[in-house]
From Swiss-Prot:
Keywords: ATP-binding, DNA damage, DNA repair, DNA-binding, Magnesium, Nucleotide-binding, Nucleotidyltransferase, Transferase. It comes from the Bacteria. Participates in a DNA-damage check-point that is active prior to asymmetric division when DNA is damaged. DisA forms globular foci that rapidly scan along the chromosomes during sporulation, searching for lesions. When a lesion is present, DisA pauses at the lesion site. This triggers a cellular response that culminates in a temporary block in sporulation initiation. Disulfide bonds: none annotated. This is DNA integrity scanning protein DisA. It comes from Frankia casuarinae (strain DSM 45818 / CECT 9043 / HFP020203 / CcI3). Signal peptide: none annotated. Residues 7-146 form the DAC domain. The keyword Ion transport does not apply. ATP binds at G74, L92, T105, R106, H107, R108, T109.
Length: 359
């Protein structure tokens, strides 16, 4: 799920400066040359108004040119797509009233220009040997691939453990659905685990972006672990969202879940109310019935439109399980062949769910 607009800008900038890109190569050359730099990643009338002195270039970008220009005093201004070097050796004069928490002259200027011009700004520190990125109101120090990979691998190991636990609670829920013994606690526990897994995956996606070409294997592992998780999140909410709920549509509920604080996410009662369940302290022990979206999604080659029609017609999973081939054929778009496939698919799922729980 997409984050705030600031997060989109931040990730897009990280991708532009990731290892393997020409721009990152230029930054690494500046670091190895033990020089500093102040680079504005964008050019418009506002940026032009902050520039004094220097000279106009408007030449194609290259890592070597960036390195050579960084040897001179003054800032470098690039085009918004980072394809051209617009100006070099310029003196940036941002509004001194723009707040900044930095102390060094170069870093203070970088933060103020980033806030005033609303373009990302890079500050390469000669003394501290770091690359600082100022974008969307935040400061971020770019680490090397080794440090990022170490954090990413730790997060991936955590994701694997959480995914294993998610599979366990989801399997238990499926068995309880077949037996019609589901409580609010059972359903909410699955939604809780799905949201936890999504958040860890979102963090790893940030590492993948930051790693650039070095994050290919990490991206493949993440994709494998997260296969079907986003669909499961939606189907679980659609299965258990109370009729006439004040919580809103499934999409709105998923948005509310994404916005929950880590503390609230651990509280099943708070989570239940976000999904639309109301009541007192015994809310978690209330028995509920699923509509059947999760189970029908596991039937092979069953179009989503047909799934919606089946759920609208029967209302609950138990009625679906009790329906015969003739009953299923009464639904628009379900012929005899598809009705038999649904009937046999649900029967197999029911048997396997019970076996997994008790054997």
């Amino acid at each position: 799920m997409a984050g705030p607009p600031g997060d989109d800008i931040f990730r897009a900038t990280l991708a532009a400066v990731a290892p393997g890109t020409p721009f990152r190569d230029g930054l690494e050359r500046i670091l190895r040359g033990h020089t500093g730099a102040l680079i504005v990643l964008g050019h418009d009338k506002v940026v032009e108004g902050l520039c004094t002195g220097g000279f106009e270039l408007d030449v194609e970008f290259s890592a070597t040119r960036l390195r050579e220009l960084a040897k001179m005093d003054g800032a470098i201004v690039l085009s918004s797509d980072l394809q051209r070097i617009v100006r070099a050796a310029v003196h940036l004069v941002p509004d001194p009233t723009v707040p900044t928490e930095e102390s060094g002259t170069r870093h203070r200027t970088a933060e103020r220009v980033a806030k005033q011009a609303e373009f990302p700004v890079i500050s390469v520190s000669q003394s501290m040997h770091i690359i600082a990125l100022y974008v969307a109101g935040r400061r971020y120090v770019l680490d090397g691939s080794a440090a990022i990979l170490s954090r990413a691998n730790q997060a991936l190991a955590t994701l694997e453990r959480y995914k294993l636990r998610l599979d366990e609670v989801a399997g238990t829920l499926s068995a309880l659905e077949i037996e019609d013994l589901v409580t609010v606690r059972d359903a909410i526990s699955v939604s809780q685990r799905l949201e936890m897994v999504r958040r860890i995956a979102d963090e790893i996606e940030g590492y993948v972006v930051e790693l650039g070409t070095d994050g290919r294997l990490l991206s493949l592992q993440l994709e494998e672990l997260m296969a079907g998780v986003e669909t499961e999140r939606e189907l679980t909410v659609r299965d258990y969202l109370p009729i006439g709920s004040k919580a809103g549509t499934p999409a709105q509920v998923l948005g509310e879940l994404s916005a929950m604080s880590p503390t609230d996410l651990l509280d099943l009662t708070v989570l239940a109310r976000v999904i639309g369940f109301s009541g007192g302290a015994d809310i978690l022990d209330r028995q509920i019935s699923p509509r059947g979206y999760r189970m029908l999604a596991k039937v092979p080659r069953l179009p989503r439109m047909v799934v919606d029609r089946l759920v609208d017609h029967f209302g609950t999973l138990q009625k679906l399980l009790a329906a015969g081939v003739d009953d299923l054929q009464a639904v628009d778009g379900v012929g005899e062949t598809r009705a038999r496939a649904v009937r046999e698919g649900l029967s197999r799922l029911a048997e396997s769910s019970i076996l997994e729980r008790y054997v």
